[in-house]
UniProtKB/Swiss-Prot annotation:
Positions bearing the Glycyl lysine isopeptide (Lys-Gly) (interchain with G-Cter in ubiquitin) cross-link: 6, 11, 27, 29, 33, 48, 63
Pfam families in UniProt: ubiquitin (PF00240)
Gene (name only): UBC
Keywords, in A-Z order: ADP-ribosylation, Cytoplasm, Isopeptide bond, Membrane, Mitochondrion, Mitochondrion outer membrane, Nucleus, Phosphoprotein, Repeat, Ubl conjugation
Covalent cross-link site, Glycyl lysine isopeptide (Gly-Lys) (interchain with K-? in acceptor proteins): 76
Note in the entry: Ubiquitin is encoded by 4 different genes. Uba52 and Rps27a genes code for a single copy of ubiquitin fused to the ribosomal proteins eL40 and eS31, respectively. UBB and UBC genes code for a polyubiquitin precursor with exact head to tail repeats, the number of repeats differ between species and strains. For the sake of clarity sequence features are annotated only for the first chain, and are not repeated for each of the following chains.
Residue(s) at site: Interacts with activating enzyme: 54, 72
Protein name: Polyubiquitin-C
GO CC annotations, alphabetized: cytoplasm; mitochondrial outer membrane; nucleus
Classification via Gene3D superfamilies: Phosphatidylinositol 3-kinase Catalytic Subunit, Chain A, domain 1
GO molecular function: protein tag activity; ubiquitin protein ligase binding
Swiss-Prot/TrEMBL site (Essential for function) positions: 68
Length: 690
């Protein structure tokens, strides 16, 4: 394959390599082309220096990857490191050495662990991942070494009255400790203290050294004015806690107050407002949380768990995670282990691509579950986007791009912010977290771009108690958005809300303008009664699924529950009761479906397409498939027809073995293509189609 090597002068070298080549081999090829001795070469990929004895495939370097070449300057240079005791150490270094490397050299000479070292140059603390040349540190420069620890220092705290207090502290003291010392001296309770340094409010859980507060620094003490406001915190058990807070309180402070009331450690708390997880260092006012707002408290389950990630090469990676970890966190852990950038990772579980912002528990991923890792293939395709003015934009995309990615590309070309864009394909509004392949959008497809009109309007929502709520909305808001606004005002979870307009129940994914809801329209809010009932769903294979539902659930909700259990997308489901096909927007009670009723599930075959599978005996099987079917799905269809277990099947197309997690469209398999089926024989012998 070809890879590129970019030098610091901007020159790019092309090399012919193989995945099994070592970094040493690659340096040899660079020497042949450029005459640079291997011992003067440092190769960098994905921000990581590559080691001579490892191979390109060890670092997941694929065709057309770009490595960066940094030259080791010969003879290097000397720098000096001065300690607080006045001792000066001489080090042999190179401009390309990282601060981390320098600390390791100091450890070699002086035995001081790197995590106890702080290096200062030109009054600035140096960061581990940066290089000496980043800080313009040249030969014979002097760095200052400060030990994290032990022995303390004095700082000053200045109050608004002008009084200055002197405190004995250590760099490792937390802001909380400092406030306790102020309370000892001045009698001011910590929760009434706000400490400011360099114009920044200091957070309780951070240390003085985190803020680079050194000896004889001056902090400013501001008192929190009493008065505050009340907010509510609702737990999953339905219990509501009332807290006294101020807009300037951080989320960390709020979690501490919850701990005081409920005994739940902050690191087990996740707080949600307006559907968004709140970050510790931000304040209530940053999130526009006002008096009598309701936050939702979700517990992080302790103890963590192990999950497995299987790559297409068959390698299995073990990760330590928690149910509350987001998919984004998981991708970061994979990057740490394997060096694969998150934006090149697609994670699949139960045949479904996982979205960055969701958690493992959202997908019911439990201990020892196996996720499949598919790399986003480079190469892509062109699609067209047509605006209402008739202008057509051409975009370079990949089937694995999300709608969010596509909107970002449109913003790059046209300057339209993503939140003002609505994309329509085949009459359907596309959701940000889904991919082009999810919607079967193929090369040269045309999407339609509709702008969300700014300026908004007011609508009214009338509850069964007769209370009327006023909401600020836009015609392009979805019903889901409207329910979130009602939750912010009234604290009613969206899944307990049913909205009715013109006698019709409104569906989450549709917009106000879809229902012709205009300014000053009145919607009616009906609460879903808790208590529920069981119904049965019988499939054509004879399998019966049991679902927990409520009479007020819509058919759409029921299909979503079936998807959760069986993985069948709602748009492929038709539900039949009493000989009648059920409509998405209607409720179970509309059809008089009562407890222990049985619905029948019929699958909608997609316009789809036919493909052929040829076995070694010469037999040809015809399958109904869709471009978005995974190879795993295809093997399941073959099992249904022929009884061959998927793990004994190998499928070949265009001389290439097909991987389970990839789709037919990934391999450009089109209607009436022929795949070859080879059986994996037990005992390791493989039969061949050729």
């Amino acid at each position: 394959m070809q890879i590129f090597v970019k030098t610091l002068t901007g020159k790019t070298i092309t090399l012919e390599v193989e995945p099994s080549d070592t970094i040493e081999n690659v340096k040899g090829k660079i020497q042949e082309k450029e005459g640079i001795p291997p011992d003067q070469q440092r190769l960098i990929f994905a921000g990581k220096q590559l080691e001579d004895g490892r191979t390109l495939s060890d670092y997941n370097i694929q065709k057309e990857s770009t490595l960066h070449l940094v030259l080791r300057l010969r003879g290097g240079m000397q720098i000096f490191v001065k300690t607080l005791t006045g001792k000066t150490i001489t080090l042999e270094v190179e401009p390309s050495d990282t601060i981390e490397n320098v600390k390791a050299k100091i450890q070699d000479k002086e035995g001081i662990p790197p995590d106890q070292q702080r290096l200062i140059f030109a009054g600035k603390q140096l960061e581990d991942g940066r290089t000496l040349s980043d800080y313009n540190i040249q030969k014979e420069s002097t760095l200052h070494l400060v030990l994290r620890l032990r022995g303390g220092m004095q700082i000053f705290v200045k109050t608004l009255t002008g009084k200055t207090i002197t405190l004995e502290v250590e760099p490792s003291d937390t802001i909380e400790n400092v406030k306790a010392k102020i309370q000892d001296k001045e009698g001011i309770p910590p929760d009434q203290q706000r400490l400011i340094f360099a114009g920044k409010q200091l957070e309780d859980g951070r240390t003085l050294s985190d803020y680079n507060i050194q000896k004889e620094s001056t902090l400013h003490l501001v008192l929190r004015l009493r008065g505050g406001m009340q907010i509510f915190v609702k737990t999953l058990t339905g219990k509501t806690i009332t807290l006294e807070v101020e807009p300037s309180d951080t989320i960390e402070n709020v979690k501490a107050k919850i701990q005081d009331k409920e005994g739940i450690p902050p690191d087990q708390q996740r707080l949600i407002f307006a559907g968004k997880q709140l970050e510790d260092g931000r304040t209530l006012s940053d999130y526009n949380i006002q008096k009598e707002s309701t936050l939702h408290l979700v517990l992080r389950l302790r103890g963590g768990m192990q999950i497995f990630v299987k790559t297409l090469t068959g390698k299995t990676i073990t990760l330590e995670v928690e149910p509350s970890d987001t998919i984004e966190n998981v991708k970061a852990k994979i990057q740490d282990k394997e060096g694969i950038p998150p934006d090149q990772q697609r994670l699949i579980f139960a045949g479904k691509q996982l979205e960055d912002g969701r958690t493992l528990s959202d997908y019911n991923i439990q201990k020892e579950s196996t996720l499949h890792l598919v790399l986003r293939l480079r190469g892509g395709m062109q699609i067209f986007v047509k605006t209402l003015t008739g202008k057509t934009i051409t975009l370079e995309v990949e089937p694995s791009d999300t709608i969010e990615n596509v909107k970002a590309k449109i913003q790059d070309k046209e300057g339209i912010p993503p939140d003002q864009q609505r994309l329509i394909f085949a009459g359907k509004q596309l959701e940000d977290g889904r991919t082009l392949s999810d919607y079967n959008i193929q090369k040269e497809s045309t999407l339609h771009l509709v702008l969300r009109l700014r300026g908004g309007m007011q609508i009214f929502v009338k509850t069964l108690t007769g209370k009327t709520i006023t909401l600020e909305v836009e015609p392009s808001d979805t019903i889901e958005n409207v329910k979130a606004k009602i939750q912010d005002k009234e604290g009613i979870p969206p899944d307990q809300q049913r909205l009715i307009f013109a006698g019709k129940q409104l569906e989450d994914g549709r917009t106000l303008s879809d229902y012709n809801i205009q300014k000053e329209s009145t919607l009616h809010l009906v609460l879903r009664l808790r208590g529920g009932m069981q119904i049965f769903v019988k499939t054509l294979t004879g399998k019966t699924i049991t679902l927990e539902v409520e009479p007020s659930d819509t058919i759409e909700n029921v299909k979503a529950k079936i998807q959760d259990k069986e993985g069948i997308p709602p748009d492929q489901q038709r539900l039949i009761f009493a000989g009648k096909q059920l409509e998405d927007g209607r409720t179970l009670s509309d059809y008089n479906i009562q407890k222990e009723s049985t619905l029948h599930l019929v699958l909608r075959l997609r316009g789809g397409m036919q493909i052929f599978v040829k076995t070694l005996t010469g037999k040809t099987i015809t399958l109904e498939v869709e471009p978005s079917d995974t190879i795993e799905n295809v093997k399941a269809k073959i099992q249904d027809k022929e009884g061959i277990p998927p793990d004994q099947q190998r499928l070949i197309f265009a001389g290439k073995q097909l991987e389970d997690g990839r789709t037919l469209s990934d391999y450009n398999i089109q209607k009436e293509s022929t795949l070859h089926l080879v059986l994996r024989l037990r005992g390791g012998v493989l039969s061949s189609p050729f």
